[in-house]
């Protein structure tokens, strides 16, 4: 079976596979991040979102894979064979788990559309010859200007907008008019 774990989220394995392996943080760092940001939702019996479910399943799979790796490490007597198994798990399975964890944590943190936009921007950047591309790669946290603005609006607005000022001005004039002082 050819199952793409990103398909229902609007991405593909190919879209994530162009990112270099060292792009993704370690599994431990990603698990710590997921725990710090989403522990309550991940441990809840309630369904939060498909990303929470996928993240939960990825964490469980990693745990099972580590149990298997521990068993192999304990029961495989040939050091060369043991090293081969550990290397395979780290290089192949570890990368897939890091990709999955990064994708779902990023989607929960920044929003799916932002992450997909970032992946496409990075894909275009990395495939553009160095002489024709900007020196710095796109950065996920700075890519969506609108997301940053939306997050700042409630606490960041200290002065009323021009529309608000216009609607308040006539009321002030009425209350200060000579007729209201009588």
From Swiss-Prot:
A motif (Bipartite nuclear localization signal) lies at residues 157-174. It is found in: Virion; Host cytoplasm. The keyword Phosphoprotein applies. The keyword Membrane does not apply. Residues 161-176 are annotated as: 2 X 8 AA repeats of S-P-R-R-R-[PR]-S-Q. Gene3D superfamilies: Viral capsid, core domain supefamily, Hepatitis B virus (1.10.4090.10). Disulfide bonds: none annotated. Residues 136-182 are annotated as: Disordered. InterPro entries: Hepatitis_core, Viral_capsid_core_dom_sf_HBV. GO terms for biological process: microtubule-dependent intracellular transport of viral material towards nucleus; symbiont entry into host cell; viral penetration into host nucleus. GO terms for cellular component: host cell; host cell cytoplasm; T=4 icosahedral viral capsid. Sequence repeats lie at residues 161-168, 169-176. The modification Phosphoserine is found at residues 161, 169. It comes from the Viruses. Pfam families: Hepatitis_core (PF00906). Residues 176-182 are annotated as: RNA binding. Its main location: virion. Keywords: Capsid protein, Cytoplasmic inwards viral transport, DNA-binding, Host cytoplasm, Host-virus interaction, Microtubular inwards viral transport, Phosphoprotein, Repeat, RNA-binding, T=4 icosahedral capsid protein, Viral penetration into host nucleus, Virion, Virus entry into host cell. GO terms for molecular function: DNA binding; RNA binding; structural molecule activity. Self assembles to form an icosahedral capsid. Most capsids appear to be large particles with an icosahedral symmetry of T=4 and consist of 240 copies of capsid protein, though a fraction forms smaller T=3 particles consisting of 180 capsid proteins. Entering capsids are transported along microtubules to the nucleus. Phosphorylation of the capsid is thought to induce exposure of nuclear localization signal in the C-terminal portion of the capsid protein that allows binding to the nuclear pore complex via the importin (karyopherin-) alpha and beta. Homodimerizes, then multimerizes. Interacts with cytosol exposed regions of viral L glycoprotein present in the reticulum-to-Golgi compartment. Interacts with human FLNB. Phosphorylated form interacts with host importin alpha; this interaction depends on the exposure of the NLS, which itself depends upon genome maturation and/or phosphorylation of the capsid protein. Interacts with host NUP153. Belongs to the orthohepadnavirus core antigen family. This is Capsid protein. The gene is C.
């Amino acid at each position: 079976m050819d199952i793409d774990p990103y398909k229902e989220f609007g991405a593909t394995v190919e879209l994530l596979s162009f990112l270099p392996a060292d792009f993704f943080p370690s599994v431990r760092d990603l698990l710590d991040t997921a725990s710090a940001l989403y522990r309550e939702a991940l441990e809840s019996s309630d369904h939060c979102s498909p990303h929470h479910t996928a993240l939960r399943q990825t964490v469980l799979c990693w745990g099972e894979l580590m149990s298997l790796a521990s068993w192999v490490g304990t029961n495989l007597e040939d050091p060369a064979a043991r090293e081969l198994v550990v290397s395979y798990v780290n290089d192949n399975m570890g990368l897939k788990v890091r990709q999955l964890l990064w994708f779902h944590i990023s989607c929960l943190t920044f929003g799916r559309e932002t992450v997909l936009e970032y992946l496409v921007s990075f894909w275009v950047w990395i495939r553009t010859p160095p002489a024709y591309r900007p020196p710095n790669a796109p950065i996920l946290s700075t890519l969506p200007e609108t997301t940053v603005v939306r997050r700042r609006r409630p606490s960041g607005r200290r002065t009323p907008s021009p529309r608000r000022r216009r609607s308040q001005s006539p009321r002030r004039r009425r209350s200060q008019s000579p007729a209201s002082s009588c």
